[in-house]
Regions:
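Predominantly extracellular beta-rich ligand-binding scaffolds that present long acidic/polar faces
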Residues: 120-123, 141-145, 150-270
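Acidic Gly/Asp/Thr-rich repetitive segments characteristic of extracellular carbohydrate-active
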Residues: 25-63
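Right-handed parallel beta-helix/beta-spiral solenoid domain characteristic of secreted/periplasmic
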Residues: 70-121, 138-139, 159
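Bacterial Sec-dependent N-terminal signal peptides
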Residues: 1-23
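Extracellular beta-strand solenoid repeats
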Residues: 56, 66, 72-74, 108-113, ...
Length: 334
């Protein structure tokens, strides 16, 4: 992190804001900036936004709108990190996104935590939809065709359902508890990701897997749900037989969690899943780096890539009916 990139002094009406109610949403629309405060600030910023605008959310818990515009929405991260003075942005309801025709390109959601779902629906084709460094219970794509879309550095604590209309959809350096089935009409790539379970009764999993770590079954389902048309390169499974039905595979391995991680691990919202030294050298990806979330072109991190509000100093007294608020903004070096 670059320490204290800049500070913003904001004067707000004393009647309109309290120290304990300082969730902040900033809206950047062209050259114009607006600041909104409180639990409804995300909703208010969204209502004022135009397609392509940027909304930045501070730490805190926010009410959520139903999204129909293509925006860039960036939170402070999905993990509390008190040692570094950073706290998460929490969405307190299911986030529903239904992008309308003409508002479907280049949507970005980054750095938010939700204990419920992200649901992307609609009929319009969605291009370059990106979810980055977020945590959700379940993520579902249904109805819309997604083209060139991406999940990166995410944690999915429940189910990931990419759906039947995905074209060049990639899941990169992410951790997924359960993966739902899809059809051969979808083109999906999992790269340097950890899949803890498969939940597929009717449709087998068909995708390209590269440099991934795969667990076995989920619940009462059987073990291997990889479709024969899947492509597997430099992947490891904890279940012997996971790759048996796959026709195109190279450099596949079987091992156990203790050899790979040093202990028996399941899904976690906080574990970094670092490989043991032996596993790092023994199980190498197509790029010569370690398999799993710390390899590849974009090694795992939970720190948002954009400047974020990490400190808010609020004056205890008003001056001329105004309350002085100092906001400190920091950003990751890369």
């Amino acid at each position: 992190m670059k320490r204290i990139l800049f500070s913003i002094l904001v004067l707000v009406c004393a009647m309109g804001v309290k120290a304990q109610d300082m969730m902040v949403a900033t809206l950047q629309s062209g050259e114009e900036s607006k600041v909104f405060y409180g639990a409804d600030s995300f909703v208010e910023a969204y209502n004022a936004a135009q397609t392509g605008d940027l909304i930045t959310l501070s730490p805190g818990t926010f009410n959520v709108p139903t999204i129909t515009k293509s925006l860039k929405i960036q939170g402070a991260g999905y993990i509390d990190d008190p040692d570094n003075g950073s706290y998460r942005t929490i969405l307190n309801y299911k986030l529903k996104i239904n992008l309308s025709e003409g508002n479907t390109d280049d949507f970005l959601l980054e750095g938010v935590y939700s204990h419920v779902d992200l649901e992307v629906t609609g009929t319009a084709t969605i291009n370059r939809f990106v979810v980055k460094r977020c945590r959700f219970d379940n993520v579902y794509f249904s109805g819309s065709t997604t083209n060139g879309s991406r999940l990166e550095h995410c944690r999915i604590a429940g189910y990931l359902g990419i759906g039947t209309n995905a074209v060049n959809f990639s899941v990169v350096n992410s951790i997924v508890r359960n993966m739902s089935g899809n059809t051969t009409g979808s083109i999906i790539v999992y790269r340097n990701s950890i899949i803890h379970g498969f939940n597929s009764y009717y449709d087998k999993i068909v995708a390209n897997f590269e440099n991934c770590i795969l667990n076995g079954s989920s619940g009462n389902f059987q073990h291997s749900y990889l479709h024969e048309n899947s492509v597997v390169k430099n992947c490891l499974s904890f279940y012997e037989g996971m790759f048996n039905g796959v026709l195109s595979k190279e450099n596949v391995w079987y091992s156990n969690k203790t050899e790979i991680w040093g202990s028996d691990k399941g899904y976690s919202d906080t574990d970094l899943y670092e490989l043991t030294d032996d596993a790092k050298s023994k199980y190498v990806g197509t790029d010569g780096k370690e398999i799993g979330i710390h390899g590849g072109d974009v090694p795992f991190t939970f720190t948002p890539s954009h400047p974020q509000i990490t400190k808010r100093d609020i004056a205890t007294k008003t001056s001329g009916g105004k309350l002085k608020v100092e906001i400190t903004v920091e950003a990751q070096e890369n």
